[in-house]
Regions:
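Alpha/beta catalytic cores of nucleotide-metabolism and tRNA/nucleoside-modifying enzymes
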Residues: 1-106
């Protein structure tokens, strides 16, 4: 969960406290359009894994706030994809793609 530095992506859970993110300038999820990953389109937001790692390691309150924004957006988007797949009668294909993506890893 966000308060413990766990961020959810379509390719699995990302543990932002891990040292490998110390210099990683990529967003949490390059396909995500949330404020934490992509910003507001006007120069605000769009934080790197390295910056979130730094905030988390320093105990800054902004770290779990940004992680929560991302995680909520992830689940809202995931549930919309589930509803769309069910409505279109292609949930089986969605489920397979979801499992393949998660197995790929972050």
């Amino acid at each position: 969960n966000a308060r413990n530095g766990h961020l959810f992506t379509r390719f699995g859970d990302l543990k932002i406290r891990n040292a490998r993110h110390k210099s990683d300038e990529r967003p949490i999820d390059e396909t995500c359009r949330c404020y934490t990953c992509a910003g507001d389109g006007q120069g605000g937001g769009g934080f790197s894994r390295a910056y979130l790692h730094h905030l988390e390691r320093c105990g800054e309150m902004l770290a779990p706030m940004l992680a929560t924004i991302h995680n909520l957006h992830y689940y809202l988007h995931l549930m919309q994809e589930v509803r769309d797949a069910l409505d279109a009668g292609r949930f089986g294909a969605f489920r397979l793609r979801f499992a393949e993506d998660r197995a790929r890893g972050v």
